Every structure is written in C-alpha cells, then in structure tokens.
C-alpha cells in the first residue's frame, strides 16, 4: 500500500512538472549580456599585473595599446616595475613598450625601480636604454629618488659612464621652453598645443614651476594671461598653488583676473599655498587701486595730428599724461601717494650711483637706435593697422596684455611642424606633459567664506588704473622689508636663477630685429632712471630735450612737481581705453590707436632710453637679491615718428563706497555642488599612488611614527648601556672591598688569638674560628647571591627587553638588600634587652673589684677600634651588599658571644667570669659604638633605596606603557596591511573576472 501511494504521488508530481516554467527552459543555459564593459586598456593593465603573458599577447594581437596609461599616467611597465615582476618587465620591453614613458608626475619606469630599490630591474632598464638623467615634475632624477646604497652606486656609475650633466638635465625643460618662447616672440604667432588630458598651456607650466623668464617672454608675445585649462585653472591658480611668488607678481602686474574661478568655483586664493596667501592679498589690493583709479578718472582721449616737419621743432610732451598731471594738481586726496613719493625719493638717492654709469652710455646707444629705426617703423605700421580691426590692446608701459575676451594671437593648435613633434618626443621631461593639480588646500566649503572676507578687504582700498603698472615701483619697499625678515621659500620645485645681462641683451637684439620694438616695461627703477635723465638733460641741453616720448612707470604722478607742466601743445598719440574698461564698456567704446607722425629725434631718443632702461633693469636684477622685483618684458608699438604710450594714469578721486564695490563685485555663479571635486579626487588618487609605489603601502604618517619609535629605542639603549656600565663598576668595587674585608678579618682574628690566648679558655678558642667561619660564609653567600642576581640580567635577550630585565634585576637586588636590613634590625632589637642588663652590671664590676685590674692593652685596643669605626663611618658611599656583609660578620660574632656569655653565667664558674670580664667590657663598648653607626648607615641607605625603588617603579610603568603602545601599533599596522592586501586582491580579481568575461564574450 505504501509503495503504491508513493508511486501515485510521484506521477502527480510529474504531471504538474510538465508544462511548468522550469520544464519549458532550454537545456542549454542562456548567457546574459554583461552590463559592465571594461575599457580595453584597463583589461590590458589587469592582464599585465596578473602576469598572464598569453592573455597579454592575445590582447596585443587584437590591437591593445602597450603604452596605455591609467588615470595617474601609469603604464603596464610602470606597474610591473612597482610589483617587482622582472619577467613582465622583460616581456613588455621586448614587445615594444616605451622604456622612457613618463607618468603624470614625470616618473619613468626607472624612477619607480630606483625608489623601490629593485636592482635587477634597474640594471635591465639601463641596459635597454633607460635615461638615467630623466627628471620628474619636481626636478628629481632616479639618483635623487634612490634610497639604497647599492642602487645609488649603480646609478652614479651609470651617470659617470654616460657623462650625464644632472644640473643641465634639471634645467632642460626651462631651456626648451625659453627657446620655444623666443621663437614664438620672433615669429609673431604662438604655436602652443594644450596638454591632451589637463588642457594645460605653456603659460600654466611656466607659472607653476616658477620659470619667470619664460613667463615674461610668453606675456610679451601677447599670450592671454587669463587662459584656462580643462579644469578652469588660470596660470595664477597654478602659480599660487605651487607657491611661486615671483610668477604671481608678474601675472598680477600684467593685470590678470585675480577673481577668476575654476570649474568648481575656486579662486586662486582658495587653491593657494598657505605661505603666500598674505602676499596675494597685498597684490590684489595694489591691483584694485589701479582698477579704481581707472574707473573713477575716465580721462578724455586726445587726438592730435601734425606733419613730420612740425614735430621736429615742436614739443611732444603735451599729451594725455600732462593733462592728467594738471588735473592731479587740483585733486584733494593725494596724501596717500605723497607717502609713496617720499619713499621713492629716498630710494632714488640710493640708486644715483648706479644710475650714473648707464647715463653715460646714453650717447653711445643713439647711433645704434638709428640703424634699427627703419625696421621698427615698418613693423610698427603693420602692427598698428592689424590692431585696428580688433579691440584695441593696451600698449601702455610696454605691457602687451590682451584685455579683451578675444585672443590677440593666432592659435594654430591643430597642426604642428614635424620639427616640433620630433623635439617633443626627444625631450625627456617635456613640459607638455602638464601639471597635476591637487585640491589639498582650499575645500569647497571654504569658498564662500573666503570670497566674503576678500570682498570686505578689497572694498576699503582705493582702486587703481589698469593700464598704469604701479606695482613694481610700489613693491620696492615691501621687497626690502622682506629681505630683512628673511626670504620666502617656495616648497614645490626649485626656482631657476635669473638670466645674466648677456642673455638679456641677446634677447633684446632678437626682439628688435624680428618684431615691433620690444621694450621692457618701466619698473620703479626705470622710472627713477628716466627722472635722472630728465634732470641731467634739462641742465645740459635745454627744455627741448624734455620732449622725447618715453616709457612711463606706474608711479606716474608722484613726482609731478619735478616735471614741466606748461609745455607747448604738440602732437601726441591717441590713447585707447584702459584694460579695466574694456571688460565693462561696449565694443564701440574701444577706440583704435590712430598713429601720427612724430619727430625722428624723439623716436630715436625714446628707443635709446627704453633700451638703456632694459639693460639697467637686467643689470639690477643680476646684482640684486633673489626677491628683488623683476621687470616684465612686453612689446610697445613704435609709430612712424613717436612711441605711442597708451598711458592712462589717474591719481586721486572720490573712493567708491563699500556698497557700490560689493554690488560691482557680487558673484552670480551657480552654487557649487556638494559632490567630490575633480581636484579632490586627484588628491586622493595621488595619495593612493604614493602608497602603491612603495610595495608595503607605507604612508608618510607611518614613516613618522616609525622614526619616533626608533628614536625612543635608541634612547632606551643608551640608558641600558649606562646602567650596565654602572653595574660593572659596582661589581668591581664590591670585589675589591670583599678582598679587603677578608684581609682585615684575618688580621683581626690573628690579633685576637694572640692577645686573649692567656685569659680565654679552650671552649672560646674552639668557638672563635667557628664564628669567623660563619661570618665569612655569610659574606660569601651574600656576595654570590648579589652576583648571581646581577649576572642574570646579562643573559642574551632581545634589545627591546634589556632595559626591562635590568630594571627587574636592580629592583630584585634592592629588595633582597632591604630584607637583609630588616633582619639585622630585628637582631638589634633582640639584643637591646641583654645590653641593658650588661649596663646595670657594669657599675657593679667597678664597685666590687675582684683584684683583677683592667688591662692597659684593652684601652689601646679600644682606641684602635674607635679608629676603625670612624673609618667605617666615612665609607657610607659603599654599596648595600658590602655594608650588609660587614654588618653580618659583626652581628653574628656578637650574637654568638652573647650566647656564650649566658651559658658561662649559668655554669657559675666565678674564676672564668673574672677572667672573661675584661674582654666582655671591651666587647660591650665595641658593640655599642658599632651598632649606633651601623644603624644610622642603614637608615640612610634605606632612604636611598626607597627613592631608587620608586624611580625604578616609575621606569617600569613607563616601559610597560611603551611596550603596550608598540604592540598596539604593530597590530594596527598588520591589520592595515592586511586590509590593503585584501583590497588589492579583490580589485585585481574584479579586473580579472571582468577581463575574462569580456574575452569570453568576444570568443563567443
């Protein structure tokens, strides 16, 4: 029945199964399409890191790029070098991997092998042609990064063998950039190519690395100072982030936008290095002064036309600047400028001696200027007609900063000449690799607060015109104050020293021959030089020599009393609106420069003086300290007769109210997202890459903690060594004192035997050697116990535990000594009662004389023993074990003597008592003096021992705490390394799974 029921149930189950969803499924398992698709490059990198050469070959056959780089710029060869996979390194190099491929920070595979200390990989890479002089973004070669001595020796030998100049290799990038910048300046157009990933330009690289000469040339070539990369960073962002003060100053003097924000809403202040924040704020105040004066004055434009003949006799000084000077005389609020004027006069007196030599060269350079005149005039006419079709650039003070949104240079970024491409490939640390930015300073949450604080600071100051660069002159005092306080130090990359005067002269010749006459913009030094020239010429040549058109520095208006204000009206050049206004005014307001014919003599003198000022400034730079203000080089357009100096200097005026400034400066940006910014993500990836480079995943904090623990262990070792030396000295002292005591005890025993042989009977003779033997045995046992305790601390232990064991041994010996002291005190207390009996008995002896007189010999012996007691009292600095051994001998002999006396007293032999009394009385005196001094010694030594015990207990607790901390650290490090290993293993397994799935899919 049961079987039938079971079969029936089974049949019912089969009927239900037929037609069910499971039955309808096909026997072959359907493969679902994988939703996750990995990049081919990521699959290739995962295969290389796993060491699967067959898979790597298959991927290469399918067209995978062997030089594919991840987000950090690391290639498979980099990763193989970091992982110490020699086979994969050889496999990749044999299959055509670029052995000198740099990552985002300029590290080539040899850098990675050198930092990790893999000698075999480094030797193989060098044998295959790796460049030992390659420099990363921070200016480090593989030799600089190497830490192990063997690696340093290998790389140094290779550098010597190849004859590589390390310093030249470090400056190679700047040299290449200088060459390119000169070519662009001479050709008149810029062939810069943005970095493929970051979008960085040559101006970004020069600003971030502090290449000031390159920066000046690029700005002189009309490079846009506000150009942005793909993250929205301007060159000022880069210079501020990497702490390059000189680059920041040059950019601000050329009127870059200091309020420009990147893609995540950060200004240059938000990403700046902490050390230069104050300097940036000072620069912003000075730039705001320029902008505010420009806005408030809005001085009228002057147009005047005249022919060449009239210009030769008329004065050319009556132009826009003299009108502004006349307005400045009536202005009421120029007190702040008067302070700066006084400072400038003091500096001018200091520089008179250096100015005199350049003034003498003025006449010599005039003939040279006449030869260049024809070329410059022809070029100037073409440039002025070209600029008329665009928004008018500001040509003031030799500053060629494009101020309109349009770029002032043709950007031919699509095609590059083959020579340029070859040079790019050859350069080992090419600046076109770009810079990596980190968001380590200036989080998104701080942006709004920093902007509000900046608005409040800037609203209080007077704002100055954009086209009059007053920064360089007004920064002189600040630069000198900085020299007194100590120069600021940049922390990112080494600052390249300035060019010498010879190279600057070559640059000037190249610039004059190829393009419109390039004149260094007037710094405060150039302004003082011009004023000295004016004074000298006014004394020698008369008023007509004052009419030469000249470069004017930003501090114009401070010395208006020195200048002639009643000049005859003459021809002048039309002046464009300022750079600050070009952003706010409509395009129609931007007038073009209408060039007029000027005096040939004026043109000659202006070019001569301008060139002289440039040479003076370069010589000044060469002799000055590194923080001295350098002069940015920029071209000015020379007319058919006169230099068009589009100077719109404005001085005082009513300062706009803070509310107007805030309205004008209010930010209308969209609110920033709370998500992680690109710069923060890059910062985290950089940190992860640093931990990947070292195979153990050790971070900087771990290294610092390790150094601290090493320092502590060294200090404990030195302590332990000192303790061991002290113990050795104590042992030597103990041995010497024991030998002396043995000798003294033997001599005393001999004396006693000789002196008392007549009176003391045979029982006492039998007893005496036993007492001495017990005393000596007790001393030997005590000394052996102490020596064994001290020697136990000298066992072979690890260094970290020596201090603890020695402390334990010291405390053990001290405890044993304390126990011995307690026993002796108990013995003393036991003896106090018989002592009092003897004292009562003593006057009876004197009262009842038995006819036996005291020996004179006894008194002599007492004196000797007093001397010995005093000697013992002076030796209080002896160790505890020695004092205890001496104390034991005395106490044992005394106690045995007491027992013997009591036994003889009971026997009642009067004759023996009478014979024994002299010795007893002498022994009692000896006992009383010995015990007092010994008791005092023991008390003092007990106090010392208590203090030492307290110290050792404190040391012991400290050592226990340190031991617990070290064990916790080791456990924490072990856990951390395990977690990192698990993460890596899981990540690699995911990559492998994804790669295998994709390969299976392709196979299917």
UniProtKB/Swiss-Prot annotation:
Alphabetical list of SMART domains matching this protein: ANK (SM00248)
Repeat region (ANK), residues: 39-68, 72-101, 105-134, 138-164, 198-227, 231-260
Gene Ontology biological process terms, A to Z: neuron projection morphogenesis; regulation of cell adhesion; signal transduction
InterPro entries associated with the record: Ankyrin_rpt, Ankyrin_rpt-contain_sf, MYPT1/MYPT2/Mbs85, PP1_Regulatory_Subunit, PRKG1_interact
Region (Important for interaction with PPP1CB): 35-38
Biased segments, Polar residues type: 302-316, 378-392, 539-554, 794-808, 881-896
A GO CC term assigned to this protein in UniProt: stress fiber
Region (Disordered): 291-920
Pfam families found in the cross-reference section: Ank_2, PRKG1_interact
Subcellular location: Cytoplasm; Cytoplasm, Cytoskeleton, Stress fiber
Gene3D superfamilies associated with the record: 6.10.140.390, 6.10.250.1820, Ankyrin repeat-containing domain
PROSITE patterns the UniProt entry points to: ANK_REP_REGION, ANK_REPEAT
Basic and acidic residues composition-biased segments: 291-300, 318-329, 336-353, 417-427, 476-486, 528-538, 613-624, 672-681, 717-765, 812-837, 864-880
Secretion signal span: none
Presence of the UniProt keyword rRNA-binding in the record: no
Tissues of expression: Detected in brain, lung, aorta, heart, gizzard, stomach, oviduct, spleen, kidney and small intestine.
Residues that bear Phosphothreonine: 695, 850
Listed Basic residues bias regions: 682-692, 838-849
UniProtKB keywords: ANK repeat, Cytoplasm, Cytoskeleton, Phosphoprotein, Repeat
Subunit organization: PP1 comprises a catalytic subunit, PPP1CA, PPP1CB or PPP1CC, and one or several targeting or regulatory subunits. PPP1R12A mediates binding to myosin.
Name used for this protein in its record: Protein phosphatase 1 regulatory subunit 12A
Lineage of the organism: Eukaryota, Metazoa, Chordata, Craniata, Vertebrata
Gene encoding the protein: PPP1R12A
């Amino acid at each position: 029945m049961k079987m039938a029921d079971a079969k029936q149930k089974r049949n019912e189950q089969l009927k239900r199964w037929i037609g069910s969803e499971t039955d309808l499924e096909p026997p072959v398992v359907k493969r679902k399409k994988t939703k996750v698709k990995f990049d081919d490059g990521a699959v290739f990198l995962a295969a290389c890191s796993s060491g699967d050469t067959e898979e790597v070959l298959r991927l290469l056959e399918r067209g995978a790029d062997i030089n594919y780089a991840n987000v950090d710029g690391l290639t498979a060869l980099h990763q193989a070098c970091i992982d110490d996979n020699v086979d994969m390194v050889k496999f990749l190099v044999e299959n055509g991997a670029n052995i000198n491929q740099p990552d985002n920070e300029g590290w080539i595979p040899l850098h990675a092998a050198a930092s990790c200390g893999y000698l075999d990989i480094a030797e193989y890479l060098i044998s295959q042609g790796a460049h030992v002089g390659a420099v990363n973004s921070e200016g480090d070669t593989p030799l600089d990064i190497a830490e192990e001595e063997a690696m340093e020796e290998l790389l140094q030998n290779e550098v010597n063998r190849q004859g590589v100049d390390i310093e030249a290799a470090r400056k190679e990038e700047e040299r290449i950039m200088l060459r390119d910048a000169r070519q662009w300046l001479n050709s008149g157009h810029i062939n810069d190519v943005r970095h493929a990933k970051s979008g960085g330009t040559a101006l970004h690289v020069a600003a971030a690395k502090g290449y000031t000469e390159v920066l000046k040339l690029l700005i002189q070539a009309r490079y846009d100072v506000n150009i942005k990369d793909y993250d929205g960073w301007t060159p000022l962002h880069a210079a501020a982030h990497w702490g390059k003060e000189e680059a920041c100053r040059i950019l601000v003097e050329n009127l870059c936008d200091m309020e420009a924000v990147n893609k995540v809403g950060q200004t240059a202040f938000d990403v700046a290095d902490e050390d230069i924040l104050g300097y940036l704020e000072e620069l912003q105040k000075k730039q705001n002064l320029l902008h505010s004066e420009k806005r408030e004055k809005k001085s009228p434009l002057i147009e005047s036309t005249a022919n060449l003949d009239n210009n030769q006799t008329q004065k050319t000084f009556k132009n826009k600047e003299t009108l502004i000077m006349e307005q400045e005389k009536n202005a009421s609020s120029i007190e702040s400028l008067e302070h700066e004027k006084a400072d400038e006069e003091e500096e001018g007196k200091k520089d008179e001696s250096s100015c005199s030599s350049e003034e003498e060269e003025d006449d010599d350079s005039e003939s040279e200027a006449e030869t260049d005149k024809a070329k410059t005039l022809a070029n100037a006419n073409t440039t002025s007609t070209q600029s008329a079709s665009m928004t008018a650039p500001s040509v003031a003070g030799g500053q060629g900063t494009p101020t309109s949104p349009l770029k002032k240079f043709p950007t031919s970024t699509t095609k590059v000449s083959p020579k340029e491409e070859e040079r790019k490939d050859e350069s080992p640390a090419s600046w076109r690799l770009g810079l990596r930015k980190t968001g380590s300073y200036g989080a998104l949450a701080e942006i709004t607060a920093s902007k509000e604080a900046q608005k409040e600071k800037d609203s209080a100051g007077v704002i100055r015109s954009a086209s009059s660069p007053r920064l360089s002159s007004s920064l002189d005092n600040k630069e000198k104050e900085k020299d007194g306080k100590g120069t600021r130090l940049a922390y990112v990359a080494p600052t390249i020293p300035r060019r010498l005067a010879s190279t600057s002269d070559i640059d000037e010749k190249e610039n004059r021959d190829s393009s419109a006459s390039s004149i260094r913009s007037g710094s405060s030094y150039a302004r003082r030089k011009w004023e000295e020239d004016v004074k000298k010429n006014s004394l020698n040549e008369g008023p007509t020599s004052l009419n030469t058109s000249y470069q004017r520095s930003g501090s114009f208006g401070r010395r208006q009393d020195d200048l002639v204000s009643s000049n005859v009206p003459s021809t002048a050049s039309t002046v464009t609106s300022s750079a600050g206004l070009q952003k706010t005014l409509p395009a129609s307001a931007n007038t073009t420069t209408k060039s007029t014919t000027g005096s040939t003599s004026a043109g000659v003198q202006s070019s001569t003086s301008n060139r002289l000022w440039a040479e003076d400034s370069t010589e000044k730079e060469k002799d000055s300290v590194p923080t001295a203000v350098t002069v940015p080089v920029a071209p000015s357009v020379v007319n058919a007769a006169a230099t068009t100096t589009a100077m719109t200097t404005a001085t005082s005026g009513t300062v706009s109210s803070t509310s107007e400034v805030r309205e004008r400066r209010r930010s209308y940006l969209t609110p920033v997202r709370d998500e992680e910014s690109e710069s923060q993500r890059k910062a985290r990836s950089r940190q992860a890459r640093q931990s990947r480079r070292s195979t153990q995943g050790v971070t900087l904090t771990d290294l610092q903690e390790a150094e601290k623990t090493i320092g502590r262990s060294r200090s404990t070792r030195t302590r332990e060594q000192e303790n061991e030396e002290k113990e050795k000295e104590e042992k030597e002292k103990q041995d010497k004192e024991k030998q002396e005591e043995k000798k003294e005890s033997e001599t005393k025993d001999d004396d006693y035997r000789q002196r008392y042989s007549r009176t003391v009977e045979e029982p006492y003779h039998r007893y005496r050697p036993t007492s001495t033997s017990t005393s000596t045995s007790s001393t030997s046992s005590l000394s052996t116990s102490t020596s064994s305790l001290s020697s136990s601390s000298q066992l072979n232990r690890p260094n970290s535990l020596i201090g603890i064991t020695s402390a334990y041994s010291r405390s053990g010996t001290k405890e044993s000594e304390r126990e011995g002291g307690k026993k002796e005190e108990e013995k003393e207390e036991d003896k106090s009662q018989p002592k009092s009996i003897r004292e009562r008995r003593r006057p009876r002896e004197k009262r009842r004389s038995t006819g036996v007189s005291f020996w004179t010999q006894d008194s002599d012996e007492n004196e000797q023993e007093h001397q010995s007691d005093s000697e013992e009292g002076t030796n209080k600095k002896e160790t505890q074990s020695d004092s205890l051994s001496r104390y034991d001998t005395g106490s044992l002999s005394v106690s045995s003597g007491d027992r013997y006396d009591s036994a003889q007293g009971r026997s009642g032999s009067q004759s023996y008592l009478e014979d024994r009394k002299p010795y007893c009385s002498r022994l009692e005196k000896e006992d009383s003096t010995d015990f007092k001094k010994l008791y005092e010694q023991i008390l003092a030594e007990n106090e010392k021992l208590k203090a030492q015990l307290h110290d050792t207990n404190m040391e012991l607790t400290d050592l226990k705490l340190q031991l617990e901390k070290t064990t916790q650290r080791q456990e924490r490090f072990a856990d951390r390394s395990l977690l990192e290993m698990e993460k890596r293993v899981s990540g690699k397994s995911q990559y492998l799974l994804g790669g295998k799935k994709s390969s299976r899919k392709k196979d299917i």
